[in-house]
Structures are given as C-alpha cells and as structure tokens.
Design a protein with these regions (language model features):
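N-terminal extension/subdomain marker
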Residues: 21-125
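Sec-dependent signal peptide recognition
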Residues: 2-10
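C-terminal motif of bacterial Sec signal peptides marking the signal peptidase cleavage site
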Residues: 16-19
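Well-ordered mid-protein domain cores that form the structural environment of catalytic cofactors
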Residues: 123-136
C-alpha cells in the first residue's frame, strides 16, 4: 500500500508540474507577409566579371524598401570550390549568411532545390512565397 501511495504521489506531482508547460506550436509563430527566395545558380565563368557582386549590391539597395514583415532570402552557389553553397538573408542591414552547406552540390538537382525551399519555408514562414530562379 505504501508503494502504491508513493507511485500515485509521484505521478500526481509529475502531472501538476508539467501540465502548465506551454509549447509554442507552428501556428503561433509570427508569419511574415511574404518570403521571397532568390535561387542563384552562379557556378559559371561569369563570376569573374563581378556580376555576382553587382547583383548583391542591387539586392541590398532594394532591401531598403522592405518592411519588417517581408523576407528576402538568397541561395547562392558560386564558381569557387572554396566557397560552399549557402543561404543568406538580405535586409536593410545588408546580407548575412544564415546557413552554409558543408559540401558542394549541383544546385539544379531537384532534391537539393526541394531541400533548400523546404528549409527556407520552415525558417522564414510567411503568408505567401515567391521564387525567383537566377542563372547566367
């Protein structure tokens, strides 16, 4: 009988202390109005002519007009084998890498494209999305 009381008291204590725990579920996350993904396949010989840097400058200039509830996300795969593909966020403060892949891959591979898009949707949820595919 004493063991049963101890078990019941333990279960009761666990229920009371964990019942008030509040997990934030997916619906409670603040949604942006819009998330735009610029998918840049720039792994080509035009990288040497500073097109990439020009594109970056243009995006930074345009980001000055974004509101706080809009996301401009960039996936970039460049010619350099030293610089792995990455995802960056562009806003009024500039461009900041938020994910760098550990290895190079073909950015046109449909499974990799799907992986990138799913990562962006999960990390930058929004009411609506846009995708812009860039290549030279």
């Amino acid at each position: 009988m004493k063991i049963l009381k101890t078990i019941l008291l333990t279960v009761f204590t666990l229920c009371i202390t964990t019942a008030c725990h509040h997990d934030v579920n997916e619906e409670e996350k603040t949604l942006a109005k819009r998330t735009v993904l610029i998918y840049m396949c720039a792994e080509n010989n035009l990288d040497q002519y500073s097109f990439f840097e020009d594109n970056y400058r243009d995006m930074i200039t345009g980001a000055q007009y974004l509101s706080d509830d809009q996301n401009l996300i960039i996936f970039a795969d460049r010619m350099s084998k030293e610089e792995k593909p990455y995802i960056a966020k562009c806003d009024k403060n500039g461009i900041k890498k938020v994910k760098v892949y550990s290895e190079d891959f073909y950015c046109t591979d449909k499974e990799k494209m799907k992986e990138v898009m799913q990562w962006v949707a999960k990390n930058y949820p929004a009411e609506s999305y846009a995708l812009s595919l860039w290549g030279h």
